[in-house]
Curated annotation (Swiss-Prot):
Expressed in the germline. GO terms for cellular component: cytoplasm; endoribonuclease complex; mitochondrion; nucleus. The keyword Cytoplasm applies. GO terms for biological process: alternative mRNA splicing, via spliceosome; primary piRNA processing. This is Schlafen-like protein 2. Pfam families: SLFN_AlbA_2 (PF04326), SPRY (PF00622). Can also use Mn(2+) or Ca(2+), but not Zn(2+). GO terms for molecular function: RNA binding; RNA endonuclease activity. Component of the trimeric PUCH (precursor of 21U RNA 5'-end cleavage holoenzyme) complex; consisting of tofu-1, tofu-2 and either slfl-3 or slfl-4. Within the complex, interacts (via N-terminus) with tofu-1 (via N-terminus); the interaction stabilizes tofu-2 and may form a functional nuclease. Within the complex, interacts (via N-terminus) with slfl-3 (via N-terminus); the presence of tofu-1 is required for this interaction. The keyword Manganese does not apply. The active site is at 211, 216. It comes from Caenorhabditis elegans. Its EC number is 3.1.-.-. SMART domains: SPRY.
Length: 433
């Protein structure tokens, strides 16, 4: 018999919308927010082969949607890509396409969620009555990198889940395996505690340059011209992170396409360290979005080249010591955390709603992009908006076709990785020297 994992499947508290409440067992959740969907994924993703099942019991009136989603899919299951949902209004949905399916459900109903990876189909049941196949899914969902996780969604409602730790109210039959009993070789486990790929560094930052600068921290400002090219500081006016992702994607893209660099979030243009107000949940939320953004670069940005550190800014008064950037970055930089996306781009992120509702501290975030390997062939990256950026002096410049040609000539290489759109235009150029 195949070995099964001793770990218990549950809802993932580090992969949820901010205001969804998950209980201590990880097997129940509720939302008291009206007219807003809040969701969460489970900790066990399923891939390869097999037939899997879990149950959801609706424990209060309101709207619910249940189903499956990849780590890269939207928590609003059924509206985004790579997610499949069945809702209380009696509709199935994926990628914003809603169709009548099954029956409506409400308080005390038990919904069975079926995933058949052998036939690549998804369907549901209500109180033991199975409905026809709802979706035929792509073969990519059999891959461990795009595997499907149980996912639930609430709007002013509550529910409980049973991944198999308790007897099912409506057993699915011998052919199906409970999610919690899936063989190890078919499970991609994820939770913050298990991966533990991100821990923030807490240090005191004694930055000061003048004794009359009271309770402000300042970075060493005597930067050489070459240092300016590889250094950028960003600070939102209100000290939040709600609009940080869109502009920093340009900087990360530019660093990837040149010689790397360091991006300081929470430092204004005058090099004064103001910090960013963040709660613990906001940290998870922000970095999940940041990772997802980088994975949507073309080609996918190599996360091995990107390191992230977070430092808590603790006021220590004004002192005469000047701490240089090089000293600061002796602190250990941690690998990119593996979290799923919540919000990407220039739109307001839900993170900022917590600023006045949860305990927050001031943090300095450092994103360090290492230089490319000089012995490898040149790769030109587009950010998630499909644009190519490169560092010029202390700013990011959108790169046009002439610049792309020059970038390749500078590297003196013919074989260059390019997105298909750029390659089609580059092909019209004469042969490079």
């Amino acid at each position: 018999m195949a070995d099964t994992s001793p770990r218990e499947s549950k809802l993932n508290k580090q992969d949820q919308d901010l205001h969804l409440e998950i209980d201590e067992t990880g097997l129940a959740c509720k939302s008291e927010v009206k007219k807003r969907w809040l969701g969460a994924r489970g900790t066990a993703g399923l891939y390869g082969n097999g037939k899997y099942y879990y149950e959801v019991t609706i424990t209060s009136k309101g709207l619910c949607r249940v189903g499956w989603a990849t780590l890269g899919g939207s928590l609003n299951i059924g509206k985004g890509l790579d997610s499949f949902g069945y809702g209380g209004t009696g509709m199935k949905s994926t990628h914003k396409k809603f169709d009548d399916y099954g029956l409506p459900f409400t308080l005390n109903d038990v919904i069975g969620c079926y995933l058949d990876l052998d036939s690549r189909t998804i369907w549901w049941s209500k109180n033991g009555e199975q409905f026809p196949a709802a979706f035929s899914i792509d073969v990519k969902y059999k891959n461990s990198n795009t595997c499907l996780f149980p996912a639930v969604l609430c709007q002013n409602s509550s529910l409980s889940v049973n991944f198999g730790s308790q007897p099912f109210k409506f057993p699915p039959g011998n052919q199906f395996t409970a999610v919690s009993d899936a063989p190890n070789e078919n499970v991609n486990w994820w939770s913050y505690e298990e991966q533990n790929s991100f821990e923030h560094v807490v240090v005191k930052l004694p930055f000061a340059v003048e004794e009359d600068v009271h309770n402000e921290f300042r970075m060493h400002t005597k930067l050489m011209l070459t240092e300016l090219k590889r250094t950028q500081c960003k600070q939102d006016k209100d000290g939040s992170i709600r609009r940080t992702l869109q502009p920093i994607s340009k900087t990360i893209c530019a660093f990837l396409n040149t010689d790397g660099g360091r991006l300081f979030l929470g430092v204004n243009d005058d090099k004064v360290i103001k910090g960013i107000s963040m709660s613990k949940n906001m940290i998870y939320h922000f970095f999940g979005s940041l990772r997802h953004m980088c994975e949507n670069f073309k080609p996918c940005s190599p996360l091995c080249r990107i390191k992230v550190s977070i430092l808590e800014v603790i006021p220590v008064g004004v002192i005469k010591v000047k701490l240089r950037k090089a000293d600061l970055l002796k602190e250990e930089a941690h690998d990119f955390p593996k979290l799923a996306c919540h919000s990407v781009g220039g739109s307001f992120c839900d993170c900022f709603l917590e600023i006045n509702k949860a305990p927050t501290k001031q943090y300095l975030l450092i994103i360090q992009v290492s230089p490319p390997n000089p012995n490898s062939r040149t790769t030109i990256f587009q950010n998630e908006e499909g644009l190519v950026y490169r560092r010029r002096m202390a700013s990011n410049k959108c790169v046009y076709l002439d610049d792309l040609r020059r970038m390749m000539n500078e590297k003196n290489q013919v074989f260059v990785d390019l997105p298909d759109e750029a390659r089609a235009e580059i092909d019209s150029f004469s042969k490079f020297d």
